[in-house]
Structure formats: C-alpha cells, structure tokens
C-alpha cells in the first residue's frame, strides 16, 4: 500500500516497480532477495520522501522514534516526464515537467528491467526546432538520448542536494 496523498507518477512508478522486483526475486530465490536489499533501498531512496524511523515497530518509542529537528522532504531525483510516443528513429516525445538541457545526464527508468543512465543528445520543440534546454513545464519535447526511448519510459535526473537538505546524514543519499 502506498501511503499519503498527491504522490507523483515517478513515486508510484519507482515504488511499484521496486516492490514488484523484490517480490519476484524472493519467490525466485530468497537469497537473491536478501542480496538485492541494498538495491531496493537505493531505488526507493531516489523518490521524494520524508525521513524514516522505525516508530513502534521494535517496541516502545525512544527519542529516535520521531524526527523532531527536520520534517522536510528529501528529494534526490527530479521527474522530467514520461515518454508518450516512441518514434522509429529511437527518439521519444513527452511533456516536460522540470527543466533540463542538452548534455545533461539523465536516467531512463524502464517499466521492467534495469535503469539506463544516458546523456541528452538533442531536443526539438513542437515546431521541430532544436532547443538547448526546456525551461517551461508542460512543453512538448522530442528527445534523443544515447539509447532508444520507448513508450512509458520515465525520464528523471539526479538533483544536486544542498548541505541544508543533507543535515542529519541519513537524509542524504546522493
């Protein structure tokens, strides 16, 4: 069950896919599941989330059962958009959600399989004109990367996390 309101498409996709992988790995081989726990945690940590505690799980609460000093969200990756149309030449068309530029390193999250880290090679706007960046959310962009883009691929970019966002150590996962 995914808790909370207003979860982004990126959050739901990452959590659902990672949990599905964990369940499938466990039923294939419980040791494979145990070996992959660091991977599952790393993937989930790429979502926007609030810091975690164990709460009441291990018994009565202690001072560490609640986070008192910082109740902000940790955001390690930005959602750039989801490919809505795959073109024959390997490019993909999508509605951009956050700014990025040609030359940026992005991560392609496939519906199944491994994520692919790649560079943005070129972008065209709705008129087919080359653009260096796409600063306007909602802009329809045709994107070319070093790999073939397919419908439902999610494009995300690692966000630079400032020192203020990393206070407390455990919140910083980059």
Language-model-detected regions and their locations in the chain:
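Surface-exposed amphipathic alpha-helical tracts and adjacent flexible/coil segments at the periphery
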Residues: 1-174
